[in-house]
Amino acid sequence: LKHRGSITPLDHDTLPDSTLNPIIEILLPVSGCAACCKLNYLLSMNFLKRILLLGTATALGLSAAQADHHLSVHYKGKAGPGKGKHVVLVSGDEEYRSEECLPMLGRILADHHGFDCTVLFSVNDKGEIDPNNQKSVTNSKAMASADLIIIALRFRNWPDEDMKHFVDAYHRGVPIIGLRTSTHAFQLRQGSYREFNSFGKKVLGEGWVSHWGGHKREGCRGVVEESNKSHPILMGATDIFADSDTYEAAPPADATILMRGLVTDSLKPDSKPVKGKQKKNRATGKVQDVNEPAMPVAWTRELKNPKGNTNRLFCTTMGAATDFKSEGLRRMIVNGVLWGLGMEDKIDGKADVTPIGEYNPTFYS
């Protein structure tokens, strides 16, 4: 597909049936689902997650190099407060299936709230979505026009030409939302941007410390920080449960803590807070009950960057694809987008965060 001399984003809303139908005919005998072949966010299906972009790239005659550079998903904003704003969602982690949840969130932001959304992926040299390829991010140039960026990254080792688009966006003051492992988003081994290995700690407000809860055994129940309960990001963000465990975190004094995460005794939504479990807090050097106090799991910062511009930053250590089965967590992210863009007056606690179609995320690895 050519558009003004370049490959168009793979957007099922803009692809005509004359283009979609041959692709569906190719994929339907294997996938068994015509709707899933329409390039929407059902990348979360294990089959489509691995072959959809590759199959589409092949059908369109793209080389592997072209696929790596161009393959991203674009959702055109419909009616809503975000009309005219561009949100770029960047996936790339080996554990928590950000390649599944970010398309779902992008579609919510576009369909329900009017934002134009572009989702970027990590792919391998065959053009398949492959979060294990730490050097890959598709269509990084999309960040050049971003009004806000959502990252769900872990130990990325991007080339300078890709890092430049992210760093330039950060320096011009673009609001950034960091999910889960984005506290340790980069592990750059060469190039001009290795100082961004500490982006989590220095900018978002925390780096990788430890699993405070038992990994794959203990869940996380969000509890609003009483002193900040009126913060707009928290409006309507209720009954949050994440089946990813609580991270150890100590945001800096200038951070506004919005929510803490009680360590629960199982991964079930009705699980109870653990009692009597103690661990050494690395920030304080003291042994404490894991829930007294509970660890911060969501906070904001407003920080001046080296170019003199101020970024609004929102970080949550929740964010596995399975965590986003929680309506409250989805609403907190939508609220975070509006807050990041200075649109607090558009937050009413009733944001529609219903996924478009099914959302059946894969459990994290």
Q: Where are the predicted features?
A:
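Extracellular ligand-binding/catalytic regions of CAZymes and related secreted enzymes
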Residues: D68-G82, E100-C101, D111-H112, L267, ...
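Acidic, Ala/Val/Gly-enriched low-complexity intrinsically disordered segments
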Residues: D11-D13, D17, E25, V30, ...
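An acidic, glycine-rich "communication" segment
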Residues: K83-G84, L179-Q278, G349-Y364
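Helical hinge/lid and interdomain linker segments adjacent to catalytic or ligand-binding clefts
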Residues: D68, V73-K78, V88-V90, E94-A185
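Bacterial N-terminal signal peptides that target proteins for export
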Residues: L27, C33, L39-L53
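Extreme N-terminal basic, low-complexity initiation segments
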Residues: L1-L15
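Hydrophobic h-region of N-terminal signal peptides that target proteins for export
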Residues: A57-A65
